[in-house]
Regions:
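Class I SAM-dependent transferase core
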Residues: 1-93, 109, 124, 136
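Conserved nucleotide-cofactor-binding alpha/beta core module
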Residues: 81-149
Length: 149
């Protein structure tokens, strides 16, 4: 991949991987490919899309209402995905769906993901994001993961 020929969004994604992810020692080829293939910007609330590749947590606001939840910084999401050492035969339970981006990354690496989210607004947001990105192996459930699943 040649950085000088990429459109702006792809350049930003490339820079995120090269300047944030790799320096955090996320080097697993499957995780890196997931970061290129799963469109992070499409999981970020529209008002914050310009910050999709920034090295910071992003507040998850739904219709200008703060849910008091955030998307993790990209390097944290990538490191979590790498440390799980997932294979295509794995099934994953994620507690706290948020925007659905981490679930989509995990779904890229595993066979099936069930993600549990307590906030019904975020369940709807995540389901829309996953559907828009044709992620079919992630199921989002409404519930409190602290109570077991």
């Amino acid at each position: 991949m040649n950085a000088s020929t990429l459109p702006d969004v792809e350049q930003a994604r490339f820079n995120m991987v090269e300047q944030q992810i790799r320096p955090w020692e996320v080097l697993d080829a499957n995780v890196l490919q997931a970061l290129f293939d799963v469109r992070r910007e499409q999981f970020v609330p529209p008002a914050l899309r310009a910050l999709a590749f920034s090295d910071l947590e992003l507040p998850l606001e739904i219709n200008a209402v703060n849910t008091r939840q955030t998307m993790l910084a990209p390097k944290v999401e990538a490191r979590l995905a790498q440390e799980l050492q997932l294979s295509k035969s794995d099934c994953v339970l994620e507690i706290g769906t948020g925007s659905g981006y981490q679930a989509a990354l995990l779904g890229y690496l595993a066979q099936q993901v069930t993600s549990v989210e307590i906030d019904s607004r975020l369940v709807t947001f995540a389901q829309q994001n996953l559907q828009m990105n044709n992620v079919t192996n992630v199921k989002v459930e409404t519930g409190d993961g602290r109570n077991g699943w």
